[in-house]
Amino acid sequence: VDNTFATPANCRPFEWGADIVTHSTTKYMDGHASALGGAIVDSGKFDWTAYPDKFPGLCTPDDSYHGVTYTQRFGLGGAFITKCTAQLMRDFGCVQSPQSAFLLNLGLESLPFRMKQHCANAQAVAEYLQGHEKVKWVKFAGLKGDKYYDLAHKYMPNGTCGVISFGLYGGRKAAETFMKHLKLGAIETHVADSHTCCLHPASTTHRQMNAEELLAAG
């Protein structure tokens, strides 16, 4: 389960049966767009040995690490996360710098307080957009009538998150005009930090795609 937007402050996936949770710590956990990072959290409850053909990397000897079989050596509680740290981090080099880890730790200290305000701000903005004559649709699980409203309140009783998606009448041209007239929001390709960020993928990160390709990409 990718819990980046909800964060542990709002959603506890392990309590609902998730086995592994991932986070882009660059987002709300850091909170200030100051450090790149990611996290994998293993519940230690999944039985990898029940599916040896699907998970040979955990259930058969690792020749690159003295022939260790992770499930045998570290048990179900440690097999996956040990492989991640011992082998995958070694091969991919995804080790956070001490300075980035320090900045992330600072961000984590205020996470619950920031998320509470992010959710309140997003709720107010979503409700305003929902009632605006130039807004065609709004997707935000905190709005009554949203198809995920009940699920959001079940799994995220403290709030959803601060990310909203909405569309304007007039299509791409109207969206680009809206972006050019922002006064408080910053035009970025980053989301989920202490700043008010506004993204329009069709004219930025996905601008090389034609109409059909944009539709296929969601």
Protein language model features and the residues they cover:
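Conserved C-terminal alpha-helix-loop-beta "cap" of PLP-dependent enzymes
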Residues: 115, 134-218
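Conserved PLP-enzyme active-site core in the AAT-like
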Residues: 1-132, 139
